[in-house]
Regions:
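Serine-hydrolase catalytic machinery in alpha/beta-hydrolase-like enzymes
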Residues: 22-60, 64-160, 254, 258
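Acidic catalytic loop of the alpha/beta-hydrolase fold
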Residues: 220-224
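C-terminal catalytic histidine-bearing segment of alpha/beta-hydrolase fold enzymes
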Residues: 26-27, 239-286
């Protein structure tokens, strides 16, 4: 009887130990949501103070405003420059936190002029809303319905065509969404440019990427900090995906089209790197 009790006690102890070891795998915390993380960052007064309001811009559009259906039985708006050929080459541009303003349209024009034959589609994740102050921009970021934003991007990908070659590009708010758009694009994706956007933190999601990523970051960025970039590099390595990082001795938003105090030297260098990357991805000559 005594031996039986000892055996039962040993069995119970082993079972408890196994349960403790197994618990972390079933109860592990999910990776922090990158979109939620950026929305929280956008509410930080220090982050807000680093974004000066855009100045008035006298600008003549080279493209046109278009609408297209989205999977949620709604309609989305975008600014389009280029041929608009179904199943052609497309660059999806995602605006910074101010919205799809004239500065973004002008940047879309510049990119289209530098990428012959490529349709540049600057999507509007705010559904027509624009911010003119950091406070307004912060509220718009926090009010974004991420499911709606993804449907806007899905609609744009459908507009491009199932066989289209699609690259994505965005700054700040749009930088993070550029990565999200590349993941949504699946086999359509041929490139992704992130200007200091919030990286995806879920390695399982990063594994769905069908393209490499070009990341342009700032060493003095207190939000998308060097530590955040380092973790992104580690996560991409775990996912088995290629990430090329260029870091500039500048602050956040140094290349934002709407930034009245943008760093001309760093922005020019970053834009040149981005353009050369896109030329290669679309197999175009400089």
């Amino acid at each position: 009887m005594k031996h039986l009790l000892v055996s039962l006690l040993a069995l119970l102890t082993a079972t408890a130990a196994f349960a403790q070891q197994a618990a972390p795998s079933c109860c592990a915390k999910p990776a922090p949501d990158a979109l939620v993380a950026f929305a929280s960052l956008a509410a930080d007064p220090a982050f807000m103070s680093g974004h000066d309001a855009p100045l008035p811009l006298d600008y003549q559009e080279a493209g046109k405003l278009v609408t297209y259906p989205t999977p949620d039985s709604s309609t989305a708006h975008a600014y389009q420059v280029g041929p608009g050929t179904k199943d052609g080459k497309y660059l999806l541009v995602i605006h910074e936190w101010w919205g799809l303003n004239d500065y973004i349209k002008r940047e879309a024009d510049r990119l289209a002029a530098s990428l012959p034959g490529v349709t540049v589609l600057a999507v509007d994740l705010y559904d027509g809303k624009l911010a003119t102050t950091a406070e307004e921009a912060s509220r718009l970021v926090q009010a974004v319905d991420n499911n709606r934003a993804k449907n806007i991007l899905r609609g744009a990908l459908t507009r491009a065509g199932a066989k289209a070659q699609v690259a994505t590009l965005g700054w700040c708010f749009g930088g993070g969404w550029s990565l999200q758009a590349a993941m949504l694009a699946g086999k359509q994706a041929v490139g992704c440019v992130m200007y200091y956007g919030m990286p995806e933190k879920d390695v399982a999601k990063l594994k769905t990427l069908n393209t490499d990523v070009l990341g342009l970051f700032a060493t003095q960025d207190q939000g998308i900090s060097p530590a955040v970039v380092k973790q992104f590099q580690a996560d991409m390595k775990k996912a088995g995906k290629q990430l090329t990082v260029h870091s500039f001795n500048a602050v956040h938003a140094f290349a934002n089209p709407s930034n009245p105090k943008y760093d001309a030297k760093a922005a020019t260098q970053a834009n040149t790197i981005a353009l050369n990357y896109l030329l290669k991805k679309f197999r175009l000559k400089a």
